[in-house]
Curated annotation (Swiss-Prot):
Residue positions binding ATP: G114, T115, H116, G117, K118, T119, T120
Protein name: UDP-N-acetylmuramate--L-alanine ligase
GO BP of this protein: cell division; cell wall organization; peptidoglycan biosynthetic process; regulation of cell shape
Coarse class of the protein's main subcellular location: cytoplasm
Enzyme's top EC category: ligase
Native organism: Sinorhizobium fredii (strain NBRC 101917 / NGR234)
C-alpha cells in the first residue's frame, strides 16, 4: 500500500532543516497539505512560504492546529511542546527518514550514501539524469545551484535522494540503486563503534531488490573490503583503482575545470566503453570520483555518452561546496561546508590544484566532541594551505571539553610541522587579518558547518571597505 492523498494536514517540526525542507516541498508538490514550524526564520523557511506553505516561527503546542500527521527529525527533543501535544492527541509521529521512504515508494529510487560526498554526488546524479531527459525528482542535503533549492518534483520515473547515515534511519529507505562513496568512523555517538557503521552500510547495499544494484567506490579501503562481503546482490565498482568496473584516469586541470577519461568495463561480456575528455567545472580528484559514481549510474540506466558529457560539463555545483562568494584585490574567496578532516584535506588539495597563488584556509571547528575525537586528524589535514586561521569552536549546543579548543589545535598544527597557523579571535578579526595576507591569485577558503558561512558571504564586502575599493 502506498501513502494515500487522504492522510490529512502534515505538520513538520523543524521544517527549515535542510533535510526536512526538501521532503516538505516534494510532499506539497504532490498535492498534500503541509505546514510546519521552526526555531527561526531562514532561507529555507522563506522559500517554502513562497510556495504557500504556512510556517510558524517558534515551537508552541497551538502550532499543530488541525494537523493529523506530525513529522520530526532526530534533532527534535522529546520535550518539544509540539511533539508533546501531538502525542497527547494520539497523532502518528513520523521520523524524517520514514516520510522520505514513503515518497520513494512512488518512484524508482537512487539513494546516495557515504560519510562524505553524498550531497555533491546526489547533485551530479540528478544533473546527469536531467541531461538524459529522465526528469528526476530530487531530495538533497544541500542547495543544488541549478535548481536554487534542495528539492524538485520531476515528471520522470526516477527519484534521487541523499541517504543520511547519521542516525541509522537510512536503512529504512527503499532504494533500487544504492551508492556508497566512502565509509569513515563517523556518528559513533549513535552507532557505538566502527563495526556497527560498517554493518549498516553493508545492510544499506544488501537492502536493494534483486533487480537493483549497488555502486561502490573501490578507492576507499573500507568500501573495497565491503565489496567482497555483499551477498546475492549486483555490485558495480568505480574509482581510480585499475580493478574498478567504471574507472576514471588521465585527470588534468584546465583552470578550475577537471578534465578526465572514464573507462567502463562490463564483467560478463568484456565490453569496454571509453568516455574521453569529460569536463567537470570543479577542481579536485574527490569531485572527479563523485562524478564517476554518477557516470556509473547514468550509463547503467541507458544514457548515451553525449548526454553524460553534457550533464557533467553543465554541472552548476552545490551551495557551500567550494562556492565562490567574491573576489578582492585579485584573490578569490570560497565558502565550503567541509568540517571533517577528510573533507578539509580533499577541499584544500582541490584548491591547490586550481590555484596559481597561495591558499589561505580559515576553519571554524564544529562541535567539541568532533574536535576531540579527531584531534590528531585535524592537526594534519591542512598541509595544502600556506596559511591557516583557526576560529573559536562552533559548539552547536555542546558543552566545552577541557583542553579541546582552537588554540590547542593551532599549537598542535604547528607542532606537526606547519609553518603558519594562527588563532583567529572571531569574525570581526577576519577581514583585517586577510587584508594583510591575501595577494592577487590567492584562494581564501572558509571551511566549516557552523556560522562561518555567513563570514564567507560578508568577507568580500568587508575587505573592500578596508581597502576603500
Amino acid at each position: 500500500m502506498k501513502m494515500p492523498k487522504t492522510i490529512g494536514l502534515v505538520h513538520f517540526i523543524g521544517i527549515g532543516g535542510i533535510g526536512m525542507s526538501g521532503i516538505a516541498e516534494v510532499l506539497h508538490n504532490l498535492g498534500h497539505r503541509v505546514q510546519g514550524s521552526d526555531q527561526s526564520d531562514s532561507a529555507n523557511v522563506q522559500r517554502l512560504r513562497e510556495k504557500g506553505i504556512k510556517i510558524s516561527v517558534g515551537h508552541k503546542a497551538e502550532n499543530l492546529g488541525d494537523a493529523e500527521v506530525v513529522v520530526v527529525s532526530t534533532a527534535i527533543k522529546k520535550d518539544n511542546p509540539e511533539l508533546i501535544a501531538a502525542r497527547e492527541k494520539f497523532l502518528p509521529v513520523v521520523r524524517r527518514a520514514e516520510m522520505l521512504a514513503e515518497l520513494m515508494r512512488f518512484r524508482n529510487a537512487i539513494a546516495i550514501g557515504g560519510t562524505h560526498g553524498k550531497t555533491t554526488t546526489t547533485s551530479m546524479v540528478a544533473a546527469l539524469l536531467d541531461a538524459g531527459g529522465l526528469d528526476p525528482t530530487v531530495i538533497n542535503g544541500g542547495i543544488i545551484n541549478a535548481y536554487g533549492t534542495n528539492a524538485r518534483m520531476g515528471a520522470g520515473e526516477w527519484m534521487v535522494v541523499e541517504a543520511d547515515e547519521s542516525d541509522g534511519t537510512f536503512l529504512k529507505l527503499p532504494a533500487d540503486i544504492a551508492v556508497v562513496t566512502n565509509i569513515d568512523p563517523e556518528h559513533l555517538d549513535h552507532y557505538g563503534n566502527f563495526d556497527a557503521v560498517r554493518a549498516a552500510f553493508r545492510q544499506f547495499v544488501e537492502n536493494v531488490p534483486f533487480y537493483g544494484f549497488g555502486v561502490l567506490c573501490l578507492d576507499h579501503p573500507e568500501v573495497q573490503s565491503m565489496v567482497g562481503k555483499i551477498e546475492d546482490r549486483k555490485v558495480i565498482t568505480y574509482g581510480e583503482n585499475p580493478q574498478a568496473d567504471v574507472r576514471y584516469h588521465n585527470v588534468r586541470m584546465d583552470g578550475a575545470t577537471s578534465v578526465f577519461d572514464v573507462e567502463i568495463r562490463r564483467r560478463r561480456t568484456g565490453q569496454v566503453i571509453q568516455l574521453n575528455g569529460l569536463r567537470l567545472p570543479m577542481p579536485g580528484r574527490h569531485n572527479v570520483s563523485n562524478a564517476t559514481a554518477a557516470v556509473a549510474v547514468a550509463q547503467r540506466l541507458g544514457m548515451e555518452p553525449e548526454a553524460i558529457a553534457k550533464g557533467l560539463a553543465s554541472f552548476g555545483g552545490v551551495k557551500r561546496r567550494f562556492t565562490l562568494t567574491g573576489e578582492w584585490n585579485g584573490a578569490s574567496i570560497f565558502d565550503d561546508y567541509g568540517h571533517h578532516p577528510v573533507e578539509i584535506k580533499a577541499v584544500l588539495r582541490a584548491a591547490r590544484e586550481a590555484c596559481q597563488g597561495r591558499i589561505v584556509a580559515v576553519h571554524q571547528p564544529h562541535r567539541y566532541s568532533r574536535l576531540s575525537s579527531l584531534f590528531e586528524d585535524f592537526s594534519a589535514c591542512f598541509n595544502d594551505a600556506d596559511t591557516i586561521l583557526i576560529a573559536p569552536v562552533y559548539a552547536a549546543g555542546e558543552d566545552a571539553i577541557d583542553g579541546v579548543n582552537s588554540q590547542a589545535l593551532v599549537n598542535s598544527i604547528k607542532a606537526a610541522g606547519h609553518r603558519d597557523a594562527q588563532f583567529l579571535t572571531g569574525p570581526e578579526a577576519l577581514a583585517p587579518v586577510v587584508s594583510k595576507i591575501a595577494q592577487p591569485g590567492d584562494f581564501v577558503v572558509l571551511l566549516g558547518a557552523g556560522s562561518i558561512t555567513y563570514w564567507a558571504a560578508a568577507l568580500p564586502k568587508e575587505l573592500a571597505e578596508i581597502s576603500g575599493s
